[in-house]
Structures are given as structure tokens and as C-alpha cells.
Swiss-Prot record:
InterPro entries: RNA_pol_sigma-I, RNA_pol_sigma70_r2, RNA_pol_sigma_r2. It holds the Pfam family Sigma70_r2. This is RNA polymerase sigma factor SigI. It comes from Bacillus anthracis. Sigma factors are initiation factors that promote the attachment of RNA polymerase to specific initiation sites and are then released. This sigma factor contributes to both stress response and virulence gene expression. Keywords: Cytoplasm, DNA-binding, Sigma factor, Stress response, Transcription, Transcription regulation. The lineage of its organism: Bacteria, Bacillati, Bacillota, Bacilli, Bacillales.
Length: 240
């Protein structure tokens, strides 16, 4: 009886609310209004100034928060706000970078020289901001990995060292992420759906089990579209 009462009185989790309002524009709009202070705080951490509703960056942040609501699912980790914060900062950084390049094109020659000097400072500033955002992306990845009882040290130790092996495993990952049923089982049970994977790939169960942690990690990375981590992977770092 007590457990039933507690269940009724328990405040719904943000993540449950988000999943319930994804197809309801009125509820979604009310939710966005409720979290405007959070949106402003995320934008301000990038711009390092107070953000008003008249700022272009504010519109970018609102749109990114709306995208976070629409995209959020079990694949994005336990915290909706951590996921939304990533999207807001990423989009605001992209906007600032594009605007600085765009403004330079339409300036006179003497103004361009002055602008170029400003851009040197802006470039350093953007590097600093991106380093912070990269760190947050890695921390988000680490928290989702922890749900699967996988640590960074384990992943580093068990990741394949040879490029051809990694490429072959990525093909397996692509098979998994295209199948919603497999992804749902992966994130719900926190283990590879081997029974569904085996008939679709030309590798043994033993191979799948040996590279289990790497395959799971790649599924998490692609499902969350981690910008910086994906750039690192596509850059082919540490090939042998």
C-alpha cells in the first residue's frame, strides 16, 4: 500500500515528461518556456555574456533545445538535460564560427585587417570553448558507457589496434544501428543482441563477444552523434 502511494506521489522524471510531449506541440512549447533559464545558461556559457531574447544566439539555443526534445530517447543516456546542453552548445558554437567568416567577406580591405586581428582572438576563444564542449561530450559518453558497466580503461585495453579490424567492426555496428529492434534491446538489456546480430553478419559469436565492448561503444557514439569523438574516429588516429 505504501509503495503504491509513493508511486502516485513521486514526481515524474524529466526524461519521462520529454518522451510524453514529443508529439504534443502545446505541451512541448510549455516545457520549453519552463526551461528558458536553463537554455540561457547553456548559451551564456559559450558566449560568456548575459543572453536576452533579442540575441540571435538565443534563437539558436531555443531551436537546439526543441531538437533535443524531438531526438531524445533511451539511446541518449539517462539525463535529458545533459543531452540538451550538448546540442545547444554545439549549435551556438557552429553559429558563431559561421557568422565570423560571413562578416569578414563583406568588409572593406582596411576593415578586414581589423577584423582579422579580432578573429585571432576569436579563434583562440573558440578553441577554448570547443575544448570545454569536447570535455562535456566525453563525460556524457562516459556516463552512457557506465550504464553498460564499461569503463574508458577497459575500452582502451580491448579496442582493436588494427585499422582493418576496426573497419570490419564498424560495418557490424552499422547493421545494428539501422535496426531499431536491435538498438532497443541493446539499450534496454545493456548487452549485445547476439541472437539478432549473428544471422546478419559474417562473423562468429566468439568474435562478437571478444569485441563486445568496442561494438557497444561505437553504437553509443553513432546513436548520440558525438561530433568531436566522430571526428577523431574518422581521422583514423593511431592506425597500425
Amino acid at each position: 500500500m505504501l509503495s503504491l502511494v509513493m508511486k502516485i506521489l513521486r514526481k515524474p522524471k524529466i526524461e519521462d515528461i520529454v518522451c510524453n510531449i514529443q508529439n504534443n506541440e502545446e505541451d512541448k512549447e510549455a516545457f520549453i518556456v519552463q526551461y528558458q533559464p536553463f537554455i540561457r545558461k547553456s548559451i551564456s556559457s559559450v558566449c560568456r555574456r548575459y543572453i536576452t531574447e533579442q540575441d540571435d544566439e538565443y534563437s539558436i539555443g531555443l531551436f537546439a533545445f526543441n531538437e533535443a526534445i524531438e531526438q531524445y530517447s533511451y539511446k541518449k543516456g539517462k539525463s535529458f538535460l545533459a543531452f540538451a546542453d550538448l546540442l545547444i552548445k554545439r549549435d551556438v558554437i557552429d553559429y558563431i564560427r559561421k557568422e565570423s567568416k560571413h562578416n569578414l567577406v563583406f568588409l572593406k580591405e582596411d576593415e578586414q585587417e581589423e577584423m582579422l586581428e579580432m578573429q585571432v582572438s576569436l579563434t583562440e576563444y573558440m578553441k577554448e570553448i570547443e575544448n570545454g564542449n569536447r570535455k562535456e561530450e566525453i563525460l556524457h559518453f562516459q556516463s552512457v558507457l557506465a550504464d553498460f558497466k564499461i569503463t574508458f580503461s577497459e575500452l582502451a585495453k580491448e579496442s582493436p589496434k588494427h585499422r582493418d579490424t576496426r573497419e570490419h567492426l564498424i560495418e557490424i555496428v552499422k547493421v545494428i544501428i539501422k535496426e531499431e529492434e536491435m538498438m532497443e534491446e541493446l539499450f534496454r538489456k545493456k548487452k549485445l543482441p547476439l541472437k539478432h546480430i549473428e544471422p546478419r553478419v559474417r562473423v562468429s559469436r566468439k568474435t562478437l563477444e571478444r569485441h563486445r565492448k568496442y561494438i557497444i561503444a561505437m553504437c553509443i557514439i553513432f546513436a548520440n552523434n558525438y561530433t568531436y569523438i566522430l571526428d577523431y574516429i574518422r581521422g583514423g588516429k593511431h592506425d597500425e
